[in-house]
Amino acid sequence: MHFSIPETESRSGDSGGSAYVAYNIHVNGVLHCRVRYSQLLGLHEQLRKEYGANVLPAFPPKKLFSLTPAEVEQRREQLEKYMQAVRQDPLLGSSETFNSFLRRAQQETQQVPTEEVSLEVLLSNGQKVLVNVLTSDQTEDVLEAVAAKLDLPDDLIGYFSLFLVREKEDGAFSFVRKLQEFELPYVSVTSLRSQEYKIVLRKSYWDSAYDDDVMENRVGLNLLYAQTVADIERGWILVTKEQHRQLKSLQEKVSKKEFLRLAQTLRHYGYLRFDACVADFPEKDCPVVVSAGNSELSLQLRLPGQQLREGSFRVTRMRCWRVTSSVPLPSGGTSSPGRGRGEVRLELAFEYLMSKDRLQWVTITSPQAIMMSICLQSMVDELMVKKSGGSIRKMLRRRVGGTLRRSDSQQAVKSPPLLESPDASRESMVKLSSKLSAVSLRGIGTPGTDASASDVHGNFAFEGIGDEDL
């Protein structure tokens, strides 16, 4: 998550009280809450009481007199660095003190009273699930409510997450972010004041080996099946004509497990796909489509001649990555305290091991750069958990009474319709041996071509380089 305080506001106190400066905290470039310095000071003091002063980053000191505009701007910058440092700290950023502060501030900023409401959550295939929640319910509360409505067992809830998406005109989803523990889903989606924004339930892991755990349960199997069919229909999962024929045959037989077993062998199974954006690889200002999954970032690009190519960047070859944001100055070239900034430009840059002794920075410019970064981090976290022999089954925080609320009226996951005929522009993949800048770019076929699964090859540009070389 990218925390920033890009602007301040001068506001009047309640009931005609004295004016004060409000600091607008943004998450991923969107306003999350509006707080006073005194509120952040109270948070700091509470964290210091719980964790000790040595753990906390520096907090801007109190001032005896009113601040000048320059001092307000200086404090804004200091508070922004403080919030970023706290969020990035594994102990402080995951603490209930920090997260509950942000939830309360979000609810107060949007002036949403605590009451019971119906919240619509979509499955990957577009099926609607209506759950009764409180406006003050946090993300885990809502996730549990959806699981209860679908009759998904408690021990499988941790395999799924809620995502905030924007629904496009063609019905496809553009992923905004994974909903976090510091926000209230009802407030997050309604505060955007647009019917385009939805909440979607989707599996939250990358390694398809974990599918086995989920497929043991009927509801889990249906959720994976519905998501996979939807991803194939959207073109997120790449299939040949023959593979498509086999999948449709398994659909007709209602062989869901066999369908998923075959789908697991397909390119981009379980990937998240992002909107078209721009990268500086293999050349500057190159239009690309980025997908994340299977411990890699995949970049698809169309070269002269309309041939579609794909380059893969493994997370185990990334030395580090960073997200940077830049904001154009208002007309006139100068910025002043309290003035709003322009649209934020986001970039994800990662340093990649191109050859045994050569690292190169690759930059992707996209409004979804932070979501890409979160995907990278979660892939690394999952690899570390697997390496240590751990499990992604997480212990759930229990509600009062120690049990999960189960809905009186449960809802089944609808079986999706049969697959439609594949789009000729993406019906196959073919092997290409050409390489650009030491990263192999695989061809993804042209209309009328076909290939078997054995013709699909991974990125072997780094053969002979071990992970220990990083």
Swiss-Prot record:
Residues 400-426 are annotated as: Disordered. Its main location: cytoplasm. Residues 115-432 are annotated as: FERM-like. Residues 115-206 form the Ras-associating domain. A 1,2-diacyl-sn-glycero-3-phospho-(1D-myo-inositol-3-phosphate) binds at residues 36, 38, 62, 75. GO terms for biological process: endocytic recycling; intracellular protein transport; receptor-mediated endocytosis; signal transduction. One of its GO terms (cellular component) is endosome. GO terms for molecular function: phosphatidylinositol binding. It comes from the Eukaryota. This is Sorting nexin-17. It comes from Bos taurus. The lineage of its organism: Eukaryota, Metazoa, Chordata, Craniata, Vertebrata. The gene is SNX17.
